[in-house]
Amino acid sequence: MPVIKLRENEPFDVALRRFKRSCEKAGILAETRKREFFEKPTTVRKRAKAAAVKRHLKKLSRENARRVRLY
């Protein structure tokens, strides 16, 4: 869990913002949402494979767009 130390004469709002930012970087909220409900292992694998396919298609489209601009 991210820990922040209050600086001298630091407003609470600024400290809260720093804490939220550190939680965001640590991925605590995303992890909590992911673990909120049980997900079957087959569903996890299926979602991971779909994400990999999406990344691959995105990479291919970027390469094709780059080739088109070169001509």
Swiss-Prot record:
One of its GO terms (molecular function) is structural constituent of ribosome. GO terms for biological process: translation. One of its GO terms (cellular component) is ribosome. The keyword Ribosomal protein applies. It comes from the Bacteria. Keywords: Ribonucleoprotein, Ribosomal protein. The keyword Phosphoprotein does not apply. It holds the Pfam family Ribosomal_S21. Belongs to the bacterial ribosomal protein bS21 family. PANTHER family: MITOCHONDRIAL 28S RIBOSOMAL PROTEIN S21, SMALL RIBOSOMAL SUBUNIT PROTEIN BS21. This is Small ribosomal subunit protein bS21. It comes from Psychromonas ingrahamii (strain DSM 17664 / CCUG 51855 / 37).
